[in-house]
From Swiss-Prot:
It comes from Pseudothermotoga lettingae (strain ATCC BAA-301 / DSM 14385 / NBRC 107922 / TMO) (Thermotoga lettingae). Keywords: 4Fe-4S, Cytoplasm, Iron, Iron-sulfur, Metal-binding, S-adenosyl-L-methionine, Transferase, tRNA processing. Its cofactor is [4Fe-4S] cluster. It is found in: Cytoplasm. Pfam families: Radical_SAM, TRAM, UPF0004. Its EC number is 2.8.4.3. It comes from the Bacteria. The gene is miaB. [4Fe-4S] cluster 1 binds at C10, C46, C80. Catalyzes the methylthiolation of N6-(dimethylallyl)adenosine (i(6)A), leading to the formation of 2-methylthio-N6-(dimethylallyl)adenosine (ms(2)i(6)A) at position 37 in tRNAs that read codons beginning with uridine. This is tRNA-2-methylthio-N(6)-dimethylallyladenosine synthase. Binds 2 [4Fe-4S] clusters. One cluster is coordinated with 3 cysteines and an exchangeable S-adenosyl-L-methionine.
Amino acid sequence: MRVFFKTYGCQMNLNDTETMAGILSQHGYEVVNLPEEADIVILNTCVVRQKSQEKYHSALGQFVKLKKSGKIKLIGIAGCGSNLEGEELIKSGADFVIGSRSIGKIAEVLQKAARGEKIVYLEDDICTVDSKTPRMRFSKHHAWITIIHGCNRFCTYCIVPYTRGREKSRPLPDVLLEVEKLAKNGVKEITFLGQNVDAYGKDLKDGTNLASLIEQAGKFEQIKRIWFLTSYPTDITDKLIETVAEDPKAAKSFHIPVQSGSNRILRLMNRRYDRDQFLQLVEKIRSKIPHASISSDIIVGFPTETEYDYMQTMDLVRKARFERLNLAVYSPRQGTVASKYFKDDVPREEKVQRLNKLLELQKQINRELNMQYLGKVVEIIVEGKTKEGLYYGRDIRNKVIIFSSQEVSEGENVLLKIDKITAGPLYGKLQKKCGL
């Protein structure tokens, strides 16, 4: 039977889809790229925002219609939506629901669904997913590697601890076995993933940590670049900063969500730091790694956010000068502390206005930061082509650079001279191909 996956949300969901696709492929299923080619559709869902939840519900409705017309046979739901909604998704037309920590059992669940059973399987079987688990990688040169599942932080706005569970790290030897396997298969870039990736190893209580993992993963000659995300500010250690600074294979890039620049709002969010501590962390990273790229996330319109709170956020963005900034308006998530106890009292129009002002500020900062690239030669790893047929890739600071060429290969290292900047990607001219 043929299976189509539609994936929503974060990189961990992408990695989970790769895992489920690999397991099903090993069990004789054919993974296809188009839903019209499939007998089975699996939606790997995200509920971090209301909009993402609405998207997969809309898709579920469309696929239910296709099933009634006989064009598909089964519909499955995976990801965070499974843990949040469970049986309700069966009532909405799904044939099976599998939890985010249950994906190692996807073949067994699908077999039961194929026999006509309506299945909701939400058990914590995440230990069954390890270096031996087959994965269908969607990139030839880059691989996602989930090293820690779940989150213990319980920020008041966030649904993740309720849908992904508590933190559970993979043993370091098992992660390194996966890295070794990838290196042998020609992968040259890896990204270590976790909702709170810097907490990696704490629960193992054997000294394992992210810094030591990066150091050991870099010993594989084929691996040329190592990324990690997402970071929680107070879990970034001096040792991690030193490792990123000194290890030539470690990408000089940190993604550190700040969420607000107001100390009052940070306390309401249960973020365990204040604005000064965050800015001191940014300064520390840049003092050790002068050209480090630091990106962040911000939520605008959190309950009770005043104009003063918002201006504090604007001020923090001016001082931090992020390379990139992911912005979102606050939306209550079912089951979180904020949805239970805080009234969503900032008008939608005000939220959007605040977001747009922050977006304009960040664009201005981006243009200013990007000016330093003009005329410089940088090395990137080619990732693919744009819709316009141009090639693109990233440098070691996570800067996207677009260029034209007669022919280069995905995963190839090339040197580019930057001749055009924007508030987003840079543009360059090919100077030299450095090979695969």
